[in-house]
Amino acid sequence: MKCFQKLYIFILILIVLMAGCESNKITGDSKETQIKKSFAKTLDVYPTKNLEDFYDKEGYRDGEFKKGDKGKWVIRSEMTTELKNENMVSKGMVIRLNRNSRTCTGEYFVRIVKEDSEGKVYSDERKYPVKMENNKIITLKPIDDEKVKKEIEEFKFFVQYGNFKELENYKDGEVTYNPEAPIYSAQYQLKNSDYNVEQLRKRYNITTKKAPKLLLKGSGNLKGSSVGYKNIEFTFVENKEENIYFTDSINFNPSEDK
């Protein structure tokens, strides 16, 4: 009889544990879906070939916006490469499209992170101010470096050619969520045949053949927030000796001029 009672209790505990595991699984899947939906609102603008279209695009608005403020779009794309025994080099551009004045300014930047003989790390960054007119990036100051000048002339933001129509097909992501911060993320292993991976390889000298991981990382309310951020990162290589990754972000904020 005692054996039967012990067996009954054991089975009961097992059922409760299994139910708890299943409950956690459902919650996890639900959170991944929520993160996807939160990012979908931002990723829907990919691709937007003509950047001036953002003057007429409305973003998420909350109490941070003053009355009459149409807001501004902040768009940033950056490629970082650190090969073995070489400096880490980041090149990219950020622009701010003011929907009130329908003007756009920003800067192209080149950042080099170096390590001296004593192991001290320091950063050297150069910024080149730009503006946008008729969907064309124009430098505001003369540039002597022909290589940099060409990089600016040929620069395209990821939002102009990226496409996330396959987002729903990304499965089994590594999901993290901290409701206190709040910070959330979902990471997926991609294939080299992925459209966005192919586009990045066409435009950048990516030396590795490894397929990247896609990280969707955000902060603020999952339902929307003008004070949070949403970043996209394609990581091809990440270790102590080498790093190759591409980052992109599009955020809608108060313009601060109202």
From Swiss-Prot:
<keyword id="KW-0449">Lipoprotein</keyword>
<feature type="lipid moiety-binding region" description="N-palmitoyl cysteine">
    <location>
        <position position="21"/>
    </location>
</feature>
<keyword id="KW-0564">Palmitate</keyword>
<dbReference type="Pfam" id="PF04507">
    <property type="entry name" value="DUF576"/>
</dbReference>
<feature type="lipid moiety-binding region" description="S-diacylglycerol cysteine">
    <location>
        <position position="21"/>
    </location>
</feature>
<dbReference type="GO" id="GO:0005886">
    <property type="term" value="C:plasma membrane"/>
</dbReference>
<keyword id="KW-0732">Signal</keyword>
<keyword id="KW-1003">Cell membrane</keyword>
<feature type="signal peptide">
    <location>
        <begin position="1"/>
        <end position="20"/>
    </location>
</feature>
<dbReference type="InterPro" id="IPR038641">
    <property type="entry name" value="Csa_sf"/>
</dbReference>
<protein>
    <recommendedName>
        <fullName>Uncharacterized lipoprotein SAUSA300_0416</fullName>
    </recommendedName>
</protein>
<keyword id="KW-0472">Membrane</keyword>
<dbReference type="InterPro" id="IPR007595">
    <property type="entry name" value="Csa"/>
</dbReference>
<comment type="similarity">
    <text>Belongs to the staphylococcal tandem lipoprotein family.</text>
</comment>
